[in-house]
């Protein structure tokens, strides 16, 4: 999955990644540490808190559009 993430360069690539992640969850549930939405979201937040202060961090946190990211995640809740 890391190889797919490293190649994301467009909206289409990101959508493809989301579908792959969904298929992976269905096929390999036992490999997922966070098997519920609350656990998944809480650990995503925890990872951001931890990794954003890590010296090995290679993410440009100030360049992320957090409002768009929040909207994408929220739409997963309400979109039919």
State the predicted function of each range.
Residues 2-30:
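N-terminal acidic leader/helix
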Residues 57-80:
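Amphipathic alpha-helical binding modules
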Residues 21, 44-47, 69:
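Amphipathic alpha-helices that form helix-helix packing interfaces
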């Amino acid at each position: 999955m890391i190889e797919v993430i490293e190649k994301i360069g467009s909206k289409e690539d990101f959508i493809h990644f989301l579908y792959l992640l969904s298929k992976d969850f269905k096929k390999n549930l036992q490999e997922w540490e966070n098997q519920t939405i609350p656990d998944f979201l809480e650990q995503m937040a925890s990872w951001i808190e931890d990794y954003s202060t890590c010296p090995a961090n290679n993410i440009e946190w100030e360049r992320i559009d957090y409002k768009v990211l929040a909207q994408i995640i929220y739409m997963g809740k309400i979109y039919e």
